């Protein structure tokens, strides 16, 4: 199991490295990479591969979809660490993205990773039907926005605010 998890993490990182390498170079790329490649087990990709294999979906297709999900996860962690959110200065034993690159750059790097997920899903790297691509994009959008990650973060912030008022 551990070897399979390491293999999936490696393949997901290789896909992401290649995808980023083909992007136009901007000053945001280092901050994006910093937030995307801090280590981590890529457990979301492993879960996706396990489920996808039941439906006989090709390994490389699942790696690409998993890479998009990892971009969303990295964006959420970068934003979660910001001073206006949880104000965490460390992530996996390293300075958070906003500590290393500044708050504004961290916000933009997170936003760029969010949109890069949709670039991956709409790209020619993902060899599935357009209908399937649209379905994936719709679902990932829902899971990332006010019905998903952003909505959850909002609830977390409101809970913390209410907790501090009670003290």
How should each PLM-predicted stretch be described?
Residues 1-12, 24:
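N-terminal amphipathic alpha-helix initiation
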Residues 10, 17-167:
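Mg2+-dependent prenyl diphosphate-binding active-site environment of isoprenoid biosynthetic enzymes
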């Amino acid at each position: 199991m551990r070897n399979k998890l390491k293999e999936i993490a490696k393949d997901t990182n290789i896909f992401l490295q290649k995808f980023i390498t083909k992007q136009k170079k901007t000053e945001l790329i280092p901050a994006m990479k910093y937030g995307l490649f801090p280590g981590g087990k890529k457990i979301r990709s492993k879960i996706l591969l396990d489920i996808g294999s039941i439906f006989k979906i090709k390994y490389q297709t699942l790696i690409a979809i998993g890479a998009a999900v990892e971009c969303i996860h990295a964006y959420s962690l970068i934003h979660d660490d910001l001073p206006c959110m949880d104000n965490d200065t460390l992530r996996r034993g390293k300075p958070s993205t906003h500590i290393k690159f500044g708050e504004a750059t961290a916000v933009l790097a997170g936003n760029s990773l969010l949109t890069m997920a949709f670039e991956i899903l709409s790209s020619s790297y993902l060899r599935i039907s357009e209908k399937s691509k649209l379905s994936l994009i719709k679902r990932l959008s829902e899971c990332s926005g006010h019905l998903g990650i952003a909505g959850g973060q909002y609830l977390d912030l409101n809970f913390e605010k209410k907790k501090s008022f009670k003290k």
